[in-house]
Amino acid sequence: MWPPVDVRSLTAESLGRASLILAVDLLLFVTSILNITVIAFTPDLSDVIGCYLISLSVADLLTAIFVIPLSIYSTLEGNWRIGGDNSIICKSAAYLQIALFCSTVYTFAWICIDRYSAMMKPSRYSEQSLTRCKCWIVFSWLTSMLLCCPIIVARMQVVFYPDAQLCVLDWSATSAYSVTLLLLVFVPTLVTVFNTGWKIWSAMRNPAALDDSQRMLVETDPNFVLTGFLFVTFFLSWLPLITLKVCELIWGPFDMDLSMLTFFFVWLAVSGPCCKFLIYMFTNHQFRRSFLSYISCSMCCSSRSRYEYHDIGNNSFL
């Protein structure tokens, strides 16, 4: 099941691809840990929007721990192919990555609803509690896991996609399930995102029509800018891959080899969440201040420990 890597069969291309996937994995792992730690241990960030951001980072962290390492190993050992088509490992990997992606999409929808409520209905927004937010997050995760259960329990075709080094659903053989997943996950989310986003954008473009409370909220709450950048980076990271697949669907398969281009576009989309840490640092002063204070505190504690150890060593002869 886990064949040893044959070092003699490694090529420059396989090493380059494995290095790129490893870099994405490390970046995603480190930034997710930092995001979760700073938000969870900063009281000013532990609000409703902070819970949604932690949910997004947890999905990224699980991807970095359970999904991407399989792609690294498969790149180095080309004959393994994540256990092969329809293997339990391949099905589990496909299930996990689709479930995590669905939970991310649902969380984006809840973020849009939260920002819409804060902007358009500030009097009712105060009724939003952390308990209700956590219930919506749990509901989103359970729904995502249950919707993707047929991948494991049913005889659905899962194939290894060598251009991306990932296991994916054979959409041609699972068209009914694919349409159901599209209607239950992506269509409601897209409608919610575009509807609420357009209303928020229209209101912010006409600040004279806003109430004083709404205008003050827009000017003082950095979460509007933060969530806006999150949506833009998510869209831009997936745009090249979507454009390539749409072109292949419309004009048919091209004569040129697009495997390397597909590989880069897939892992560009996977690496998109790595930008969350930079977005939080540049748009939220509380996140930036907390992170810098943790860094300075850890450096001070480390230097103090070294000083005490050095002092004990110098006085050990007394």
UniProtKB/Swiss-Prot annotation:
<feature type="topological domain" description="Cytoplasmic">
    <location>
        <begin position="283"/>
        <end position="318"/>
    </location>
</feature>
<feature type="transmembrane region" description="Helical; Name=3">
    <location>
        <begin position="93"/>
        <end position="113"/>
    </location>
</feature>
<feature type="topological domain" description="Cytoplasmic">
    <location>
        <begin position="42"/>
        <end position="47"/>
    </location>
</feature>
<keyword id="KW-0807">Transducer</keyword>
<dbReference type="GO" id="GO:0032870">
    <property type="term" value="P:cellular response to hormone stimulus"/>
</dbReference>
<dbReference type="GO" id="GO:0004930">
    <property type="term" value="F:G protein-coupled receptor activity"/>
</dbReference>
<feature type="transmembrane region" description="Helical; Name=1">
    <location>
        <begin position="18"/>
        <end position="41"/>
    </location>
</feature>
<feature type="transmembrane region" description="Helical; Name=2">
    <location>
        <begin position="48"/>
        <end position="72"/>
    </location>
</feature>
<comment type="function">
    <text>Probable high affinity receptor for melatonin. Modulates potassium channel slo-1 activity to inhibit neurotransmitter release at synaptic junctions and promote a sleep-like state, called lethargus, during larval development. May function presynaptically to regulate synaptic transmission. Required in rectal epithelial cells to promote pathogen clearance, acting upstream of multiple G proteins including egl-30.</text>
</comment>
<comment type="similarity">
    <text>Belongs to the G-protein coupled receptor 1 family.</text>
</comment>
<feature type="topological domain" description="Extracellular">
    <location>
        <begin position="245"/>
        <end position="257"/>
    </location>
</feature>
<keyword id="KW-1003">Cell membrane</keyword>
<feature type="transmembrane region" description="Helical; Name=5">
    <location>
        <begin position="176"/>
        <end position="194"/>
    </location>
</feature>
<keyword id="KW-0472">Membrane</keyword>
<feature type="disulfide bond">
    <location>
        <begin position="90"/>
        <end position="167"/>
    </location>
</feature>
<protein>
    <recommendedName>
        <fullName>Melatonin receptor pdcr-1</fullName>
    </recommendedName>
</protein>
<keyword id="KW-0675">Receptor</keyword>
<keyword id="KW-0297">G-protein coupled receptor</keyword>
<feature type="topological domain" description="Extracellular">
    <location>
        <begin position="73"/>
        <end position="92"/>
    </location>
</feature>
<dbReference type="GO" id="GO:0005886">
    <property type="term" value="C:plasma membrane"/>
</dbReference>
<feature type="topological domain" description="Cytoplasmic">
    <location>
        <begin position="195"/>
        <end position="223"/>
    </location>
</feature>
<dbReference type="InterPro" id="IPR017452">
    <property type="entry name" value="GPCR_Rhodpsn_7TM"/>
</dbReference>
<feature type="transmembrane region" description="Helical; Name=6">
    <location>
        <begin position="224"/>
        <end position="244"/>
    </location>
</feature>
<feature type="topological domain" description="Cytoplasmic">
    <location>
        <begin position="114"/>
        <end position="134"/>
    </location>
</feature>
<feature type="topological domain" description="Extracellular">
    <location>
        <begin position="155"/>
        <end position="175"/>
    </location>
</feature>
<keyword id="KW-1015">Disulfide bond</keyword>
<keyword id="KW-1133">Transmembrane helix</keyword>
<keyword id="KW-0812">Transmembrane</keyword>
<dbReference type="Pfam" id="PF00001">
    <property type="entry name" value="7tm_1"/>
</dbReference>
<dbReference type="InterPro" id="IPR000276">
    <property type="entry name" value="GPCR_Rhodpsn"/>
</dbReference>
<dbReference type="GO" id="GO:0007186">
    <property type="term" value="P:G protein-coupled receptor signaling pathway"/>
</dbReference>
<feature type="transmembrane region" description="Helical; Name=4">
    <location>
        <begin position="135"/>
        <end position="154"/>
    </location>
</feature>
<feature type="transmembrane region" description="Helical; Name=7">
    <location>
        <begin position="258"/>
        <end position="282"/>
    </location>
</feature>
<feature type="topological domain" description="Extracellular">
    <location>
        <begin position="1"/>
        <end position="17"/>
    </location>
</feature>
